[in-house]
Amino acid sequence: MAKQIQAIRGMNDILPTQSPLWQKVEAVLRSSVSAYGYSEIRTPIVENTDLFKRSIGEVTDIVEKEMYTFEDRNGDSLTLRPEGTASTVRAGNEHGLLYNQEQRLWYMGPMFRHERPQKGRYRQFHQFGVEVYGIGSADIDAEVLMLSARLWEKLGISEHVTLELNTLGDPAERAAYRDALIAFLEQHKDKLDEDSQRRMYSNPLRVLDSKDPQVQGILTDAPALMDYLGEESSQHFAQLRELLDAVGIQYRVNPRLVRGLDYYNRTVFEWVTNSLGSQGTVLAGGRYDGLVAQLGGKDTPAVGFAMGLERIVLLLETLGLTQDIPAAVDVYVTAMGENCLVEAIKVAQELRSALPHLKVMSHCGGGNVKKQMKRADKSGASVALLIGEEELAEGMVTVKHLRNDNEQQQVARNALSAFLAELTK
């Protein structure tokens, strides 16, 4: 026997038993962004490597360690996309979507990072994101946060997630703070872990995000970014908090919250949970007003967020919120004998037309009554329709209930659609 080929480590199959939960999550995401008037954009999985070096930042873990990069036959350096924002900006610039225009966009699809696989963190993962271009005021920051809060409400997990907020100021304010932070870190350099020492000069704000307990202790006395904000940045953050208070969205200001990507400015945020251990962040984003120009477009304000679907699915499973997932099949149609096969297929087809919401499966491959009923039960259907010689002669269909103790009953062929509509409403 030939050796089986396995999936690549960290790249997982989503099996038929798992896909209904994924479909539920995806449906909630689509309906929620639609309610806010956002439009979908789809971009290629493969992009020029320079796109991510210029957007994410060369001195980041993603670019340095995690990207799937290869050279094609033309000698061009290409990369499987590790996140969705850069591709969305590239597409907006390329197709003239962003010049003097407002755009509210969303995307969903697979991303790739060569990380150590663990629960909630994979090498291929599915990301959902929202991006807004052309609006620089705090009210749009509030809107994307209201939209994210609506997602948790629709998924039934509002009580299990918490919003954390911070502001990174504008580039000049951040540069002044950066110098002050470097000066502080230099005084404690010998006590910093290797990762923080490496980042101290290249990306010092990322040291604030260190998970090392000793580094966190040192940072207790570090200068605060809030002290370096100008009036405009302070007012922007104050207005955002005022709007969130007005609509009842609770949050915690976390002065150490930074983002792992270089392009963020002003507002940054994360939704976190205590239910997933170390993988506590379930959605993250912020404002990135300089990225469009950085990638060759005009100066354009922008704000957005992204979330990993694997982590949301894991959270729903962990919280036991998977019971209301509908079965893959509602009605299973059987044919008891060769003469009844054509009638059974016609019944199934008519039901699909008359009741589009109904999931109807026809038995194929023949077999006796026992085999067909075993398949019907395994399908997850709530009822089986039995069509035998007797039913065929009398213009009837036998309805057998598979998930309760109701007695089976005979229904006239021409009344079957109305009967099932009432039964399944």
From Swiss-Prot:
Catalytic activity: tRNA(His) + L-histidine + ATP = L-histidyl-tRNA(His) + AMP + diphosphate + H(+)
GO cellular component terms, A-Z: cytoplasm
SUPFAM superfamilies, per database record: Class II aaRS ABD-related (SSF52954), Class II aaRS and biotin synthetases (SSF55681)
Keywords of this entry: Aminoacyl-tRNA synthetase, ATP-binding, Cytoplasm, Ligase, Nucleotide-binding, Protein biosynthesis
Enzyme type, top EC level: ligase
A Pfam family: tRNA-synt_His
Annotated compartments: Cytoplasm
Disulfide bond annotation, renumbered to this chain: none
Keyword tRNA processing (UniProt): no
Top-level taxon in the UniProt lineage: Bacteria
InterPro entries: aa-tRNA-synth_II (IPR006195), aa-tRNA-synth_II/BPL/LPL (IPR045864), Anticodon-bd (IPR004154), Anticodon-bd_dom_sf (IPR036621), His-tRNA-ligase (IPR015807), HisRS-like_core (IPR041715), HisRS/HisZ (IPR004516), HisRS_anticodon (IPR033656)
GO-annotated molecular function: ATP binding; histidine-tRNA ligase activity
Enzyme Commission code(s) on record: 6.1.1.21
Keyword Protein biosynthesis set for record: yes
Gene Ontology biological process terms in this record: histidyl-tRNA aminoacylation
CDD domains per UniProt: HisRS-like_core (cd00773), HisRS_anticodon (cd00859)
Description of how the protein assembles with itself and partners: Homodimer.
Entry's family note: Belongs to the class-II aminoacyl-tRNA synthetase family.
Identification of the protein by name: Histidine--tRNA ligase
Organism: Shewanella sp. (strain W3-18-1)
Classification lineage: Bacteria, Pseudomonadati, Pseudomonadota, Gammaproteobacteria, Alteromonadales
